[in-house]
Regions:
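Short alpha-helical "recognition helix" segments of helix-turn-helix
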Residues: 62-69
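Short, conserved aromatic-histidine micro-motifs
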Residues: 104-111
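Short, basic alpha-helical nucleic acid-contact segments in DNA-binding proteins
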Residues: 81-103
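Single, function-defining residue in the core of a domain
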Residues: 1-57, 65, 74-75, 79-87, ...
Length: 414
């Protein structure tokens, strides 16, 4: 078996990045993850087994062979599966602890506000034809780090209720989050938001409660950008109404044509017809916000929303470098353990790397980043002569490609 991951060689460094106030033994017993040894030396060994299976992509049998060679544990594949299934909630606590540790770091603010992007990514088990798991993520745009995570099954819809919010935050969300009750929740928590909306996402009204004609407003817009005041109702009664700013930005003809072609292509693939209103709305970007206009003019709101792309890049890192989309388990509890172990490895690697690009790779006038070949799994590299190592930055993530066919059990210590 060829496992070229330095994660297996640097256990002490991995453990040093765990939250200092997180008691592994106490929390493992509270979560019933480690009540008796039964072939596993101690709690730390159980975590190492989870990281070998989930973080480094070993199979259950390979993990048992590796652990036996290092005298960490003496288990069969089914026994290891049972232990990992019971440990899934505990591994989730470790993920939460790592994220809480990152949240205590000071973050830069934009005009006194903390910018957070909210999004979710789908994960499928082997052989699945639909979403099996959905990872809901809050992402701090100043630090470039994940600040909150919620894992649900495929039926867990994307909405702002999955995460929590604090005063002084500006939450950035795509059009799927443009729901009246979601926006009310963010405002009740004292935070603000900028969310994209579609022509049929919400029922918009004039501030006085009369019907609002969106397409008449779009056609009447003279410049490239503009705004109008609208009202969004979460239900009957004035107390549930939100008065918001609708920011409108007219796309260039080329951008509008590209979006319209995408809509037509998707409709043809599904065997449906495109609503003419969708083709008309494709010419615009529409944002909803409750931020004050005197402090945040329309151009600033549009500029802030453009930072949202960074969470999409974070998902690409999770899937291409951390291999989060290579879920190998079908049993729900084992799949949870695998995902949490992979997230632990990813978050520790992010702490060590700690770098955020300064601009979007797809921004106008910017060269696109060439994607590296997909790797499984990522490694925390310390090879000074390696292809991904900069002598000034010895803690960078290196990508190691693995043979999928086992060859020999490695002699590594973790």
């Amino acid at each position: 078996m060829v496992i070229r991951s330095d994660l297996l060689n640097i256990w002490e460094q991995v453990r040093a990045h765990l939250p200092p106030d997180f008691d592994l033994e106490r929390t493992a017993r509270e979560r019933c993850a480690f009540l008796r040894k039964r072939g596993v030396k101690d709690v730390a060994s159980l975590l190492r087994l989870a990281l070998a299976y989930g973080g480094c992509g070993m199979s259950l049998r390979e993990t048992c062979a590796w652990a036996g060679a290092l005298k960490l544990a003496s288990l069969s594949g089914p026994s290891l599966m049972e232990r990992l299934c019971k440990a899934a909630p505990w591994l989730g606590d470790i993920v939460a602890g790592l994220i809480s540790q990152q949240a205590t770091l000071p973050t830069k603010r934009w005009a006194g506000y903390r910018l957070r992007a909210i999004d979710a990514t789908a994960i499928c088990q082997p052989g699945a034809d639909r979403t099996t798991w959905r990872l809901h993520v809050g992402f701090d745009l100043a630090s470039g780090q994940v600040d909150q995570i919620a894992l649900t099954d495929g039926r867990g819809a994307e909405n702002l209720q999955r995460l929590t919010y604090r005063p002084g935050e500006i939450v950035l969300g795509d059009r799927i989050y443009a729901r009246a009750h979601n926006l009310q929740l963010v405002k009740r928590d004292g935070a603000d938001f900028i969310v994209r909306t579609g022509w049929n996402s919400l029922r918009l009204k004039h501030p006085n409660g009369s019907d609002f004609d969106l397409f008449a407003t779009l056609r009447a817009q003279a410049g490239q950008e503009g705004e109008v005041r609208v009202r969004v109702d979460d239900g009957p009664g004035e107390s549930t109404a939100l008065e918001l700013r609708l920011i409108i930005w007219r796309k260039t003809p080329e951008q509008a044509e590209t979006e319209q072609k995408r809509l037509l292509k998707n409709a043809k693939k599904r065997g449906t017809k495109v609503d003419p209103r969708s083709l008309e709305a494709a010419k615009y970007v529409m944002l909803l916000t409750a931020l004050p206009a005197d402090a945040f003019p329309a151009c600033d709101v549009l500029a802030i929303y453009r930072f949202r792309w960074q969470i999409e890049l974070a998902f690409k890192r999770m899937k291409s470098l951390a291999g989060l989309d290579e879920l190998a388990a079908k049993e729900p509890a084992l799949a949870q353990a695998w995902l949490y172990a992979r997230l632990i490895a990813f978050l520790i690697a992010e702490q060590i790397a700690g770098q955020v690009p300064e601009s979007s790779p797809s921004a106008p006038g910017k060269a696109r980043i060439k994607q590296k070949p997909r790797a499984k799994p990522f490694a925390l590299a310390h090879d000074k002569n390696g292809p991904h190592c900069n002598p000034r930055h010895h803690s960078r993530i290196a990508v190691a490609r693995h043979s999928r066919r086992p060859e020999a059990i490695p002699s590594v210590s973790m």
